[in-house]
Amino acid sequence: MLEKLGHPEKDLRIIHIAGTNGKGSVSAFLRSVFECAGLKTGMFTSPHLVDFRERIQVQGDMISKADTTRLGNRLLSMDFGVYPTMFDYCLAMALLYFKEQQCDVVILETGLGGTYDSTNACGVPDVTVIAKIGFDHMAILGDTLAKIAAEKAGIVKHGTALVLESQEKEAMDVLKQAAERADIKTTKVVNWDEIKILPQKDGKQCFSYAGYDAVTMKMLGVHQYENAVAAMLAAELFFEKYFAGKKNVPELKALQHAIREGIDRTQWMGRMELVSNDPFFLMDGAHNSNGVEALKKSLETMYPDEKFHFIMGVMADKDYGEMIRELLPLALDFKTVTVESERALQGEALADCIRAKGIPAEAYQKLADVLPDFSKSSAEKTVAFGSLYFIGEIKAFLQGKQ
């Protein structure tokens, strides 16, 4: 496809991101940092929550409906000699659009795995980031961390600079071997022990890392410290390559300020998103056991000794039993909903599974019946999770209500 389109990716400076959890947050942090540094930034991400066009953004703005239609019709009219998937078409559209928009930097998030992901056809990126690796999509990627890590490591290519988030030893060994095979000259590993978590500042999380003191961020959740640091390291590596040999290179202080400012400004829909303080309603896209573990840690840290009403919608191919088990110590009860997807687990079956673990659960047909009444004050705390598709449905519903 790219060959028939004239290889638009060859005119782009790319940061390639893979990982089971956190890659969307790392992408969002990077986009914000680059925009603060004055670079025109394209971002390709998936899935979307409410609008398909969320997948293709420049400077934080979605591709227009007119450009989506124009580029979509162009792609659909071409004979590629193969049968592209929707994801293939979407990526091709993104690359054409980013080239037209003359982006200085493009952030590409893998859709699934790495080795055989469509984004891996885009040549050697300036920087490659591997976020947290855990168990998900095991029928496709493999049933051990080592197998899953090997798929993610398929995006590590000779000539790129590499950033790794901390990993289980089994996964890290595979990633380091891949870096060695590709003869990677620069590898930076996020060291969790070097992240100093500070008291919140003006309602924002705050931390220090290496030369950066008291960095603030709106993004909530304990796991976001590491995602933020991964983005900071990736940005430093990209700036080093991007400004090499250029005239009028910004001072180091200015770039460091852009990194701090970008981390502070970052917002990302559906990730530990506090929709309302009173009544308290938070939603998170945690959709596998590792994601729910991170959600649990964040809730315990941010709201110690609190119990929650959980709203859950999940896909049938997920390890929903383990996801439920993680949250049992924090749960008052569960409300379940069937997500609008062929892959969804029926809400009643999910409620049965929860009740079998000794926690009250009830299945509902309509979102309106499970969400808090936002017109009334309440001390109760409600958290929705289980699937990004489910969070997208809630966002669309709330926007309709507003």
Place the predicted regions along the sequence by residue:
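Extended acidic/charged loop-beta regions that coordinate divalent cations
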Residues: P47, C90-I140, M172-A214
